[in-house]
């Protein structure tokens, strides 16, 4: 697995939205910053693993087990707040 340099929050959100919408595109629907990823059934047990792997690559480090909580992955905005930190 190639580890890339960490992304700033704004770029992280943009890239994550692009990745999610490309990967899980549904006719007539798209994922936004505040879309409920579990609530609207965009994520399942396999997709969350893919999302965790993508996030780890984007932030340049593994996510500790204790940070893998549903509330940290409920939306793109929540993921960015939790893992991408603030823009400098």
What are these regions (language model features)?
Residues 2-29, 81-88:
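Thiotemplate assembly-line natural product biosynthesis machinery
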Residues 12, 33, 72-75:
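Short, conserved alpha-helical segments within structured domains
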Residues 21-42, 60-69:
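Phosphopantetheine carrier-protein modules
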Residues 40, 79-81:
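Acidic pyrophosphate-coordinating catalytic loop
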Residues 47:
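Two-component histidine kinase catalytic core, primarily the HATPase_c
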Residues 66-78:
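AMP-binding/adenylate-forming catalytic domain of the ANL superfamily
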């Amino acid at each position: 697995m190639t580890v890339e340099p960490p992304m700033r929050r704004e770029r992280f959100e943009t890239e994550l939205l692009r990745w999610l919408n490309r990967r899980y595109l549904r006719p007539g629907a798209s994922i936004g910053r505040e879309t409920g990823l579990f609530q609207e059934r965009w994520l399942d047990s396999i997709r969350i693993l893919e999302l965790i792997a993508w996030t780890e690559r984007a932030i340049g480090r593994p996510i500790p087990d204790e940070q893998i909580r549903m509330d940290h992955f409920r939306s793109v905005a929540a993921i960015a707040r939790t893992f991408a930190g603030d823009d400098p």
